[in-house]
Amino acid sequence: MRASPIRIPTVTSDTDWDFCFHLSQQTKIPEHQRTDESSPTSGSEESEEDTKAKEKVIDHMSHPREKLAQSQKKIAQLIKGKKNIEANKELIRCVTLSRIIFGEEHWKCAQALATLAYGYLTLRGLPAQAKKHAESAKNVLLTWKGTTTSDKEEKQILETLVMLYYTLGVVCLLQNHGREAYFNLQKSERNMKELRESYKGGTCGLQVSEKDLTVALGRASLANCRLNLALVYFEKAVDNVIANKGDSTSELVSLYQEIAQIEQLRRNHEQAIQYLHQAHSICVSLYTEVSPQAAEASALLAKAYAMSGEVQHKA
C-alpha cells in the first residue's frame, strides 16, 4: 500500500517568524550605543518616532524570562481550547525569547525550535515549515558545545530529540520519503526508550505519545513495503491504546482499519475481515448504525468480503 501523494504547502516568507527574529535583534543594543540621559547628546537628536519605537521594543521585551514562562503556560491553554493559530504564534514568541535569554547556539533555543516545528506539523498541518525549524533545531544541537548541569536538563534534551526526530520522520512520510522517514523515527524511538529508562518506571511528560510514534513507525514500515514489521508496530499501538483507554475507544477504529489493509496486502483476507468487524462494532456502539462513521466502516467491511470472494456477509 502506498500513501497518496499530497501537496506540500511552501511559503517563501514566514511573516511571524521574520518579525520576531528582527525584533530579537533590535533588543540587543550594544553598550556603547546606549544613551545616557544625564549627559548631553552629541550630533542630531533622535526623532520622536525613533524614541517611541525603541521604548515599545524595550517594553515588549522586558523581563524575557517571565514572558517566556507566561507564553509557555498560554500555549497549553490555547491548545486545549483548540486555538491552534494563536498557539502557534506563542510558539514563535517562545523561540524569540529563547534567543534573547540563552542565545542562538544554546540547546534551550533548539528546544524552542523543535517545539515550534512540532506545532507547525500537528497544529497547522504545514510540513514544509515544520521541516525548516526542525532542521534548525537539529543544527543547533549538533553544534552546541556546552554541558548539561543537571539530570533534569539531560531529560529535557532527550525530550527535544524525541520531538525533533518524530517531526522530521512524519514530514518525510508525508513527502513519500519512506526510508528517510523510518531512519528519523527510529532515532526518535531510541531516544524515547532512553528517556523512559531514565525515569525508572515513572511518568514523563512527552508531547509525542508512544502510540503516535509507534503508528508513525508502522506507516513508515508500510511505505518501505515491510508488511510484517508494519503489522508488529500497529499491533503494539493497539495494545497501547487498549491499556490506556480500553477496548471501545474511537482511536482503535482507524488502527483496526489500517491493520486490515496490511492483512489484505498479505493476502490474509479472513484476518482483515475480523479487524474490520471490530472497527464496525466500535462505530456502531459509539455512534449509531446510520452514522457516517458506521457507514464508512460498513463499506470497508463489504469491500473486504468482496475481495475475499464472499458474496454475502453477516452484519
Curated annotation (Swiss-Prot):
Q: List the coiled-coil residues.
A: 65-90, 179-200, 250-280
What does the entry list under GO cellular component? centrosome; cytoplasm; midbody; spindle
Membrane spanning stretches: none
Query: Highest taxon of the source?
Result: Eukaryota
Specify whether Cytoplasm is a keyword of the entry: yes
Give the UniProt subcellular location, in the record's own words: Cytoplasm, Cytoskeleton, Microtubule organizing center, Centrosome; Cytoplasm, Cytoskeleton, Spindle; Midbody
Region (Disordered), start-end ranges: 28-56
Name the Gene3D superfamilies on file.
Tetratricopeptide repeat domain
Q: Which UniProt keywords apply?
A: Coiled coil, Cytoplasm, Cytoskeleton
The name this protein carries in UniProt is Tetratricopeptide repeat protein 23-like
Species the sequence originates in: Bos taurus
Phylogenetic placement of the source organism: Eukaryota, Metazoa, Chordata, Craniata, Vertebrata
